[in-house]
Regions:
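Adenine nucleotide-associated cytosolic modules
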Residues: 1-190
């Protein structure tokens, strides 16, 4: 987590059995402690950090989700479960494909000062709880997974949608499963 929003959201969650990592700058793979799940919380849009976290989640085979406070919305997701859902990179590609105006607003939001009320903190904590429940669901049923929850801060609307993987994605596509296996690099030696 980072910033005041991250600190307050983490304060609302049961973190007694968690490892907390306060990011003071960019997030890199080596700086992330091993955990059973990775949850990121911050103000602004930080796609490079989210993508690095997602790549660590896929490399370690653990679920990940992030919450971002943007100028007009509070977004949680996608809830990524390696081997079951689309990755963050696919989410970014779909976002740019369908909502270029929103993507430009997100880029602008990274430079704005952090500002939020207690309601946004509670909604973010609730979104994380729902994302964790999604991750723990053993059977995805008819769900595509990669759920994204968005609370519109202007109109007060709540939206939920799922992320569809991009064809031939090297991170989450089933075509590349064998290359992503932890021992793939040394498999020919055994």
């Amino acid at each position: 987590y980072t910033g005041e929003l991250g600190r307050k959201v983490v304060g609302m969650l049961d973190t007694s059995r968690s490892r907390l990592h306060r990011a003071t700058g960019s997030v890199y793979a080596a700086s992330l402690p091993y955990a059973s799940r990775i949850i990121s919380v911050w103000s602004g849009h930080r796609p490079e950090d989210r993508d690095r976290i997602d790549s660590v989640a896929f490399a370690r085979g653990i679920p990940a989700v992030g919450v971002e406070l943007l100028p007009t919305s509070l977004e949680c997701g996608p809830a990524v479960v390696p081997g079951r859902t689309a990755c963050y990179r696919c989410y970014q590609r779909r976002l740019h494909q369908h909502r270029e105006r929103t993507a430009s607003l997100m880029r602008a939001g990274a430079e704005l000062p952090e500002g939020f009320a207690g309601g946004e903190v509670a909604i973010a904590a609730g979104f994380i709880g729902q994302a964790l429940a999604d991750m723990n669901r053993g059977d995805a049923g008819t769900s595509l997974g990669g759920e994204v929850r968005v609370f519109d801060l202007v109109q007060g609307g709540l939206h939920k949608y799922e992320t569809v993987a991009v064809d031939r994605c090297e991170r989450c596509g089933s075509r590349y499963d064998r290359r992503r296996h932890p021992t793939a690099a040394i498999a020919h030696l055994v």
